[in-house]
């Protein structure tokens, strides 16, 4: 399965809903979209991974570089909706500490 991206704007933020796999073959498309949004002046960008079933190291690299690019432009980039293998790889690599978005009321009681 490839990668499909759908961008919406609401409440001062742009959300990219990704569907499919983020891997070596599809990560450039995500990188381009994220860069375009930040360069166009979006100050809050969210990547919704709810419908993403796989993310390899090239996908992680795109997310890290986009995060750094956003910070350099005084913008934010966060990830939401990660679950299963995708959430596990974000947590294992430590990227969850600065990428995963979630209001306090959604956080588990044990603080994870």
Where are these regions (language model features)?
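STAS-like cytosolic regulatory interaction modules
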Residues: 1-53, 65-112
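Conserved G/P- and acidic residue-centered "switch" motifs that form tight phosphate/ATP-binding loops
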Residues: 56
């Amino acid at each position: 399965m490839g990668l499909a991206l759908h961008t919406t704007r609401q409440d001062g933020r742009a959300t990219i809903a990704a569907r499919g796999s983020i891997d070596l073959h599809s990560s450039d498309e995500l990188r381009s979209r994220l860069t375009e949004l930040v360069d166009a002046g979006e100050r809050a960008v969210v990547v919704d991974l709810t419908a993403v079933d796989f993310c390899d190291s090239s996908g992680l690299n795109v997310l890290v570089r986009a995060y750094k690019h956003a910070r350099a432009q005084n913008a934010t980039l966060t990830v939401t909706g990660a679950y299963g293998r995708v959430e596990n790889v974000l947590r294992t690599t430590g990227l969850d500490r600065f990428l995963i978005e979630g209001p306090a009321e959604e956080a588990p009681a044990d603080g994870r």
